[in-house]
Design a protein with these regions (language model features):
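Carbohydrate transferase catalytic cores enriched for Leloir-type hexosyltransferases
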Residues: 1-366
């Protein structure tokens, strides 16, 4: 549960959604222990008769806690759910690992030092986990390519992710929506949205340049939201492109505001060379927002014909896509409709039930 202690981005939101859904499902286990290096935030996980929070100290950096502290301090488990790509290499219990996409393109976007620290543990999990849960076959293939490992197929289980119920269309007069748009500086005009970590593979400079190319043709603003882990000079680039007041970078957005920013957007753009079963794309579609993304296997699988796909993340390509979608009301409405249809087929309830079934099967040997 370490991921729930910090900023709740992708994996933390997956864990949180699964735990909330488990509370609504029949749990075959006598007890579900939430192992954490320090107490979870108050109220994050509602009380449940089978849930028990267990603080396992000392609180040391992530992989050290997972690899050394957990195996030394925790003994009497039937099965461990490791929710984020790695698991304790030496442990007395069975282990189920949730793994996400890690393509060669994604690998190249991370610092070499981080890859050296992380990849051996992920490779071990892929080879030796008692069961591996992934969102799709394409995710599995990209994971194998990025880690240069073959995952035993008999241990693989598929469980697609979903957007949670907080993400939905809202009427223009919604007071919560109006307040959020005012606070983030996008009230009074339509806007294009990007949500996610700012990384090399997501073509943020190219998106800004593309927006400059079309900014005289549309009334929209561009809103970028997400942690700037690479320390890109976004404000400097915005100034260089002459987009002050039209392009806005808001950094990390509190979890409660994210659904509102989606609901108010006129278009969502994720021009990424490597993604998993993209939660941000699902959240945008479920909010009734048309999506532009790259024509890559994982994104094709996630969107299933419900997004406007482009071949690359060059500025001229993205500018053309912006003109196409924003300039064609019929296409815009059709993408909105198809996105809502696609996400209606994906639920956290199904994903949570599948993960519970896998855990029970591994624990009991059935």
């Amino acid at each position: 549960m370490r991921r729930l202690l910090g900023v709740r981005t992708g994996v933390a939101r997956v864990i949180h959604s699964i735990l909330l859904e488990w509370q609504r499902l029949p749990i075959p286990f006598d007890e579900v222990r939430l192992l954490t290096p320090r107490p979870l935030p108050a109220g994050l996980i509602p009380p449940h008769p089978k849930f028990r929070e267990v603080v396992v100290g000392p609180d040391v950096p992530g992989l050290l806690w997972e690899q050394l502290v957990l195996p030394a301090r925790v003994r009497d488990l039937d099965v461990l759910l490791a929710p984020s790509d790695t698991m304790p290499m030496l442990a007395p219990w069975k282990r189920v690992v949730m793994m996400y996409a890690y393509s060669p393109e994604m690998a190249a976007s991370f610092p070499w030092s981080a890859r050296v620290r992380w990849e051996p543990f992920a490779r071990n999990a892929a080879r030796n986990g008692d069961a591996i849960i992934v969102s799709s076959r394409n995710i599995l293939e990209t994971l194998e390519q990025g880690l240069e490992v073959q995952v035993p197929r008999e241990r693989v289980h598929y469980a697609p992710l979903a957007a949670d119920a907080r993400f939905h269309p809202r009427p223009p007069g919604d007071p919560e929506l109006a307040d959020a748009l005012e606070r983030y500086g996008v009230a009074g005009a339509p806007y294009i949205l990007f949500v996610g970590k700012l990384s090399r593979r997501r073509h943020i400079p190219e998106l800004l340049t593309a927006f400059r190319e079309v900014s005289a043709e549309v009334p929209h603003r561009l809103l970028l939201a997400g942690p700037n882990l690479l320390q890109l000079d976004i404000d400097g680039l915005i100034a260089e492109l002459g987009l002050q007041g039209r392009a806005l970078y808001r950094g990390f957005v509190p979890d409660g505001d994210v659904p509102l920013l989606y609901a108010g957007a006129d278009l969502f753009v994720l021009a990424s060379e490597g993604e998993g079963f993209s939660l941000t794309t699902l959240e945008a579609m479920q909010s009734g927002v048309p999506v532009i993304t790259l024509d890559r296997p994982n994104m094709i699988e996630v969107t299933e014909g419900a997004a406007h796909l482009v071949p690359d993340g060059r500025a001229e390509t993205l500018a053309g896509a912006l003109r196409t979608v924003l300039g064609d009301a019929g296409l815009h409405a059709d993408l909105r409709r198809r996105g809502l249809e696609r996400t209606s087929a994906l639920t956290w309830s199904a994903m949570a039930q599948r993960s519970l079934d896998v855990l029970w099967s591994v624990a009991t040997g059935n």
